[in-house]
């Protein structure tokens, strides 16, 4: 089995489904690069991710991003056959902090404007999580903020940081 495959299976992954806002994706990419977490971009983006666009944006960390592109969710699922997909949504009821994260989890986030498709949430409701907010008039957290909260909790729970300090 190729080493890259083993690494993808044995670690947390992050997937963004059809991200629309370049700075959000850039912030998530930096977060993933800093933690050596693979980033999966699923579907079309509202912006270009080619070398020229990345250089123009000054993303000096981009070579460190473990980036994978997928045309759709089925392709993502096929690329990570051993992963447990966990979906983050403002529509979910279960708190992310009540979830027991595993090394094989792939944290899936939807578009900034609409979130994940309704049919995806319905089909995976038992693995849908939300990040609570105290103010009911605030629609949602910024995508990059939400990814940071969930990813660091997953890394904490799976002992990644503890292993680094030993």
Region spans (language model):
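Post-transcriptional modification and biogenesis factors for structured RNAs
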Residues: 2-166
């Amino acid at each position: 089995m190729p080493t890259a495959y083993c690494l993808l299976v044995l670690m947390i992954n992050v997937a963004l489904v059809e991200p629309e806002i370049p700075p959000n994706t850039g912030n998530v990419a930096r977060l993933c690069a800093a933690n050596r977490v693979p980033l999966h971009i699923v579907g079309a983006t509202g912006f270009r991710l080619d070398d020229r666009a990345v250089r123009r944006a000054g993303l000096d960390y981009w070579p460190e991003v473990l980036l994978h592109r997928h045309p759709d969710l089925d392709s993502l699922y096929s690329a990570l056959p051993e992963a447990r997909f966990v979906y983050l949504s403002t529509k979910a009821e279960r708190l992310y902090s009540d979830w027991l994260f595993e090394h094989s989890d792939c944290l899936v986030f939807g578009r900034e404007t609409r979130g994940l498709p309704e049919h995806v949430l319905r089909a995976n409701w038992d693995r849908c999580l939300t990040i609570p907010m105290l103010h009911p008039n605030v629609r949602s957290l910024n995508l990059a903020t939400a990814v940071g909260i969930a990813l660091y909790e997953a890394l904490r729970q799976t002992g990644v940081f503890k292993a680094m300090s030993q």
